[in-house]
Structures are given as C-alpha cells and as structure tokens.
Regions:
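PLP-dependent amino-acid enzyme catalytic core
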Residues: 1-462
C-alpha cells in the first residue's frame, strides 16, 4: 500500500514516511491509495477480542510492513497500558436504541489519547531505528495539545511545540499543556483562535527550507496515523452491538472532521455503518456545508465546547477528495478558493456523494447546557459539553438502527460549563488531583510566523 496526496502533486509515500511527514508537500493530506476491505467473518472475529488485538487486526493492513507483527503488537500494548479502564473504550446505554461510547479513559481524559499514545510509540520506534531527531509541531483547540505533550514528553529524539489560542481553552486543558516540566516540551499561547494556530502550522509545513532545517513532523489530524488509530473504536463498539450482522449508526461531535472521517474509513473497510451524523456547536460550518453545499467560513464564536470552535475543518479535504472521484486538481482548486476567498461551493455530484454517507445537526449553547442537565438528572451520566452536543444531535436522528454517540472528553476537563448546567463541579481523577498546584511553563506569542519559527530554531534540541 502507498499513500497519495489529496491534491495530487506530492510524492507517493509508504506508511512510515507518511506518518513522519504529516502534511504533503503540495499542501494536501495523505490517504491510502486503496482501503483494504475486511470480510464479514473477519469483522465478526473481532468480537470478544481485547481492544489491543482489535487494533492490531484493523490497522495491520495499512502499515505496509513498517513494523514487524510482533513489534506492532508490542507498540499497541504499550500505547494503551496507561488507560484507566480495562475495556479502553467502554460503552453505556442511554436509551433503548442509544449508546454512549466513552473515549475519555486515557492519560489526558480525551479521545485524542487513542491516537496520540500510539503515535508516540510508533514515532519512537521509527526514530530509534534511523537515529533521526524530529520537531513535532501541532495546533490545538485544547485536547490535541495535551494528548501530544503527554505522548511525546521525555522522548530523546523529539522536540514538541504546541500552539494553542490564548484564552480560548479551558483551565484544565491549558494546565495539561503548561505543567509538564520535560525539557523537550514547549507550550505556545498564540494571540488568535484555533484557525489562527492551524494556519500557522500549515504555513510552517509549506516553508520547505524551515521544514527541512528543523525536520518538521506533524501530529494534528492532518497526520494519517492519527485517523487510522481512531478507526479501531468504530469496529470495537459496532461488534459489541452485533456487527457485521446488525448495522449501526454513529453521531460524532466534530470540529476538524478527523474523528468522523475515521468512521468513514471504517465504513469503507466494510463495517455496516448506516449513517455518520456530524454534530456541531454554534460554529457549524460542516452542518451548513452539508445542508446548502456552500462551505463558507465565518468568524469563530467562543463556546462552552471550545474544542469544536473551528471554521476550517482540515480533514474535510479528505472526504472531498473521494467525493470528487479522487481528482486532486479539483480539490486543490477548492482549497485555493478557500484560502483566497474564504469558501467554495461543493458540486452537486460531490454533495450527493457526501450526503449518501453523512448527515448533520447542530446544538446551540442553551441546548448543550440543557442536555448536560437533563442527562445528569435522568441517568446520573455527566457529559462534557462536546459529548452533550453529540447526544443532542443524536436524539434527533434515532431510528430502528442502534445509534452510538461518541463521548469525546471527561466532564472534569470543562468543570465551569458542567457546574453551570448541573450545579455540581466534576472532580478530576486522582492522578490529576494536584493539577492546579503545579507550576506552569508557557510562552505567549503574537500571530507572527517568523517569531514562532525563530523560537523553534532556538529551543529545539536545547
């Protein structure tokens, strides 16, 4: 298997190079040149296996021999050994045909740990073989940054620089990024919003002289390995409910489209997913795009679900690539229109292709808070605001097919929003009880590419 860019003009790579590269040289995102199918028997055979074994069986066809079978199994085992639940991704029933998939039992209490903990292991193994040193740069709306720092802190051959929007993440999210004292970790508070941070990271990747000089690597969901790791829990949850003999649907709270795109890949592999429901907050560009066909950016509105406060959903480009028949030139044209004019119109054929698979909904601030309060009172289940967005949207799409809503973060990561809705402040797990007593290390920077690049040059390897 080889990996190709969504814009059609970058080198074709193998899995390891794709993982270490992140963003393609033509500005596109890498995808496998084909999606290997799983047979019904293979999918059924996942039932009853450990999460680690399911991960091995689902991901193995994509890694192109980059790791031996034994090494890959070992790296997966190490990646998930620090999770706080033996099932890794346990499921709870909310209503007769509605289930909640808890993805917040990892080290930083968010779904990003499923991918980031594995990527940390894969990077370490690959770099140990080559003797290379890389500079990991990422943008975060909150959870990606803390998950990346937790996965890479203390590694000898990796420097980590995480850009987050100053004043636009929760206190818990910020402290998870700013309190690790490892010398290879650098938290950068940027004046702007998440889209500002994401644009700066993409600009660094497109500055080839800088990219090569510091050996830049990316761990945002532009990195294919991130998406691949998230495919697994779609399979693990679906087989629990009877797949492949019984179809399921998923509702996914999403801003950057990476998590729901992992569900799309699972469907491409043969998992019987009836519908993938995109749940957005008031920053609803994905909902508007599917509804009208117009992908038109607007100003980011701060919300109680800040990890979804995004207008430029990077991974949507991957879905567009398939919807346009894998026409890289057409996708490149759309992305140029987005950069130059702030939006584009999706062709009717591509829009129909997307609507065959995806549907969408949005939750207002009031609806999000009301969902947190209602579920806590009715079931005792306390949701984070992002998960509440998912539940609210899922409830409008329930049918005879079981619906699985992804619970993306622990409620204690967003205590103010949860307390405002329920009157009770959620507690952090014991291992994080002293988070607010730890010293912070953070550098605040303006929205200036040159200033950020200069800091990275100075600090990497220091």
């Amino acid at each position: 298997m080889k990996y190709i860019s969504t814009r059609g003009a970058a080198p074709v790579l193998d899995f390891e190079a794709t993982m270490l590269t992140g963003l393609a040289r033509d500005g596109g995102l890498y995808l496998p040149d084909h999606v290997p199918p799983m047979t019904q028997a293979e999918i059924a055979g996942l039932a009853g296996q450990s999460y680690e074994e399911q991960a091995y069986l689902v991901m193995r066809p994509f890694i192109c021999g980059a790791f031996s079978d034994d090494e890959f199994r070992s790296l997966i085992s190490k990646a998930y050994s620090g999770f706080g639940h033996p099932a890794r991704a346990p499921m709870k029933q909310l209503a007769p045909n509605h289930f909640l998939l808890e993805l917040f039992h990892g080290p930083t209490l968010a779904f990003k740990d499923f991918a980031m903990q594995l990527i940390g292991q894969l990077f370490q193994a690959a770099l140990a073989r080559s003797g290379a040193r890389v500079t990991v740069v990422g943008a975060t709306s909150g959870d990606t940054g803390s998950a990346a720092i937790e996965a890479f802190r203390g590694l000898e051959n990796v420097d980590v620089f995480i850009l987050f929007p100053h004043g636009r993440v929760s206190d818990v999210q910020r402290r998870q990024m700013t309190t690790p004292d490892n010398s290879n970790v650098h938290a950068l508070a940027i004046d702007g919003d998440f889209d500002t941070c994401q644009a700066l990271v993409k600009d660094m990747f497109n500055d080839f002289a800088f990219r090569d000089a510091v050996q830049l690597a990316g761990v945002n969901s532009i990195n294919w390995a991130r998406v691949l790791a998230q495919v697994v829990y779609y399979f693990s949850s679906a087989v629990t409910l009877g797949a492949p003999h019984r179809p399921v649907s998923f509702t996914v709270p999403t801003g950057n489209f990476g998590d729901v795109f992992a569900g799309y890949i699972a469907r491409q592999m043969g998992l019987p997913i009836e519908k993938l429901v995109i749940a957005t907050n008031q920053n609803d560009i994905l909902h508007r795009a599917l509804s009208s066909g117009g992908y038109l950016t607007d100003g980011v509105k701060p919300s109680i679900s800040p990890s979804m406060d995004i207008q430029v959903s990077s991974n949507f480009e991957r879905a567009l690539f398939d919807a346009y028949g894998r026409d890289g030139a057409a996708v490149a044209q759309l992305m140029d229109e987005l950069k130059q004019g702030g939006g584009f119109q999706i062709s009717q054929g591509a829009l129909e292709s997307l609507r065959d698979i995806f549907t969408s909904g949005r939750a207002s601030e009031e609806e999000t808070s009301a969902t947190i309060a209602r579920l806590a009172a009715a079931t005792g289940e306390v949701l984070c605001p992002h998960s509440a967005v998912g539940v609210h949207v899922a409830e409008a799409h329930l049918s005879a097919t079981p619906m699985i809503t992804l619970a993306t973060a622990h409620p204690a990561k967003f205590p103010d929003a949860v307390e405002a809705a329920t009157g009770a402040r959620p507690r952090l797990p014991a291992r994080m009880a002293d988070l607010f007593e730890r010293d912070e290390r953070v550098t605040r920077l303006p929205n200036e590419l040159s200033a950020i690049q200069e800091l990275i040059r100075e600090r990497r390897g220091a």
